């Protein structure tokens, strides 16, 4: 879970987009893969993982939540992918992780449409596995953790690995270029316009360039 009001509110965009200090493409590609490696480390670890999700899961924070095995949502939880509104695609292997939970149309609504989905919708869509009052979130997450910790660890690990392999058999083949797509989209005029509009609290005017 996150500290404070939110699970993870995502990147700080007030720096104009950020990026590595070294401008060489080879270093930008290396830097951009850090989040992907963190996502896969969570998704592929042997242990069962449970997100205790309060407040926002935005962008990379939403990717982290979907990388876990289960998500317990507080009644104030919500999800949003703001990447589309800042002129870039979603990376960190986040697209297939969401697709497996919510399905194609809902994934498009969230990622291409930038919609915000709140607790009851997330439960209905299968993104979260349980919905509880905020005050009961951590106790419920601990109950789930205790339940799975009592299971045979070897069998549980093999089941988790097999389910992940079956569900995501095409994920890497399709999404292996999402980092490069993000780097490309970050160089566009539309990306610069999106950041300008975000900082100015104005509506962007995209040109498709």
Model-derived segments and their meaning:
Residues 155-161:
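Amphipathic alpha-helical segments used for helix-helix packing
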Residues 40-154, 180, 188, 193:
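Crotonase-fold acyl-CoA enzyme core
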Residues 2-40, 87, 170:
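Glycine- (often His-adjacent) and acidic-residue-rich active-site loop
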Residues 169-175:
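Short beta-strand->loop
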Residues 196-209:
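Terminal low-complexity tails and localization/encapsulation signals of metabolic enzymes
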């Amino acid at each position: 879970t996150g500290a404070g009001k939110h699970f993870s509110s995502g990147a700080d965009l007030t720096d104009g987009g950020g990026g590595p200090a070294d401008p060489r493409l080879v270093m930008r590609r290396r830097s951009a893969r850090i989040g992907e490696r963190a996502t896969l480390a969570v998704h592929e670890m042997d242990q069962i993982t449970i997100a205790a999700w309060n407040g926002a899961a935005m962008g990379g924070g939403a990717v982290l939540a979907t990388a876990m095995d289960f998500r317990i949502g507080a009644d104030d939880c919500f999800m949003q992918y703001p990447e589309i509104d800042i002129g870039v695609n979603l990376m960190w292997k986040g697209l297939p992780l969401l697709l497996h939970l919510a399905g194609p149309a809902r994934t498009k609504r969230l990622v291409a449409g930038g919609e915000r989905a709140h607790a009851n919708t997330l439960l209905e869509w299968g993104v979260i596995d349980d919905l509880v009052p905020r005050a009961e979130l951590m106790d419920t997450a601990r109950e789930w953790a205790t339940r799975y910790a009592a299971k045979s660890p070897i069998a549980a690990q093999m089941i988790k690995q097999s389910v992940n392999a079956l569900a995501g058999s095409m994920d890497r083949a399709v999404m292996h270029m999402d980092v490069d797509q993000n780097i490309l989209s970050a160089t566009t005029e539309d990306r610069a316009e999106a950041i300008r509009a975000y900082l100015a609290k104005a509506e962007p005017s995209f040109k498709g360039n």
